[in-house]
């Protein structure tokens, strides 16, 4: 917001426009773009957003794009390890992976990870083959969650589940993710 004030004082318009979707979605041109800032400037920049991804949406004043991005990441980062652990539990109980994913997709437990299962499988396989990808996911996830926590602290917002998710992600760590991934991917190969 300080940058917006500085830019505005110099007669320069500024939008914040974070994206969501990950590398596979980016390659397909399907990144979601959340744009904060002056609506007139958003309309002026619309052709640039159309060229970059879809969907894109004006979400409010400067800073609103980042807020929605962080809220979205909190949900996705908190849900991903739960989904993988739940699938691992189902596999340990003899359930078929494809059957579980199909039922979850049509049920209240559906998340992006299960809804976009083909893309998720590609990412999961890539992350297991390349440890730096998994390490990057965990590190970036923790960074984003800490940003949400600091935003909440500054605004006086109580967020106990956020703090629980951060602790759980720290405790699970890369090795915990890797273990859950390996179990799920082993089931994929026999699927």
Q: What function would you assign to each model-found segment?
A:
Residues 58, 163-164:
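Histidine (H) residue identity feature
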Residues 65-158, 164, 168-189:
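Helical "substrate-binding/catalytic lid" subdomain
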